[in-house]
Amino acid sequence: MAAASTSSPVVSQPQFTAMNEPQCFYNESIAFFYNRSGKYLATEWNTVSKLVMGLGITVCIFIMLANLLVMVAIYVNRRFHFPIYYLMANLAAADFFAGLAYFYLMFNTGPNTRRLTVSTWLLRQGLIDTTVTASVANLLAIAIERHITVFRMQLHTRMSNRRVVVVIVVIWTMAIVMGAIPSVGWNCICDIENCSNMAPLYSDSYLVFWAIFNLVTFVVMVVLYAHIFGYVRQRTMRMSRHSSGPRRNRDTMMSLLKTVVIVLGAFIICWTPGLVLLLLDVCCPQCDVLAYEKFFLLLAEFNSAMNPIIYSYRDKEMSATFRQILCCQRSENTSGPTEGSDRSASSLNHTILAGVHSNDHSVFRKETKMRGGHHLLRDEQPPPPERPGQGRV
């Protein structure tokens, strides 16, 4: 009897602790989490896995080389030393590191996933989250910059280099924080019942947050570009009533429309399916989301390869700089800024703004002349004051 009464507190104490304290599984293997979530963990390389890995590595190499070419082109060509191109270079840097992150993923996926620890698995996913967030944030920053320049009737913003650096620092700070959140606590290691099926160590709540965050960013970009298109269309219609160049105005509007469709279309095609799949993973347990996971991962990876094409290769001078770099030729623009460098615009910027900028000034002058008044345009300077003795006689 005495022995029984002595041993009972020893047995009841662990039961009380287990019922009230969350149980964490930091020392468990990756296979433990995959088995609980029902996600298949391969033991050997099959044909499909080899094809996916080969295609993924090829895309990664193209991503890194293409974005490296963009960064070098912006560095060597002094005519690209403007805020919009600095943001494009930062976008290329984000996509370059995305290629590295995907490259690391390709060599630590499939059967190699079994060798990962909890920390290395979180690192693998955190690198992807960081670079993806930086890339999406750069796309948003470029959309905001284009919105400002169009509405101010400028080819380049007058934002100082210091402010550009601040924007870039904010982008990467936010990206690093977003990528590190699961590693510092927002995971399911201590909440095993709420683990995701697609990412077995990630919490369902984090994946919902991350998907909604990116979808909201997408909506903001849609609104910005729609506002730009509506504004340019309105100005173009106004100019067509006062100028003799309606075809040029129509071409300007259509060029902007094509650019918006390409930008938004690439984002929708590459990102929306994967983001919706993350939401279905949480909200639709009966949906077989794992069957489409690798396909949508490659699709999202292609976005980093398409960004240099959309934002850079459509620029004629950027294309010329590419050819000069690849052919090891020296350009006149690499030696220093030219006198008219501030007025030289990329074909992308010029297509959107040049016709609006020049023709709208002529329309404004015609209107003010009809009213008999004189107004200064935004880019014009007031006439110098007359000196004594130089007035009219």
UniProtKB/Swiss-Prot annotation:
Sequence positions that bind a 1-acyl-sn-glycero-3-phosphate: 39, 124-129, 210
Topological category with respect to the lipid bilayer: Multi-pass membrane protein
UniProt tissue specificity: Detected in brain cortex and in pituitary pars tuberalis.
Main location: other
Gene Ontology CC entries for this record: cell surface; endosome; plasma membrane
Modified residues (Phosphothreonine): 351
Biased composition annotated in UniProt, kind: Basic and acidic residues: 369-381
SMART domains: 7TM_GPCR_Srsx
Source superkingdom: Eukaryota
Protein keywords: Cell membrane, Disulfide bond, Endosome, G-protein coupled receptor, Glycoprotein, Membrane, Phosphoprotein, Receptor, Transducer, Transmembrane, Transmembrane helix
GO molecular function, one term: lysophosphatidic acid receptor activity
Extracellular compartment segments: 1-50, 108-121, 185-204, 281-294
Cytoplasmic compartment spans: 76-83, 145-163, 226-255, 316-393
Glycosylation sites: 27, 35
Disulfide bond residue pairs: 24-190, 188-195, 284-287
Family: Belongs to the G-protein coupled receptor 1 family.
PANTHER family noted in UniProt: G-PROTEIN COUPLED RECEPTOR
Protein name: Lysophosphatidic acid receptor 1
Species the sequence originates in: Ovis aries
Gene: LPAR1
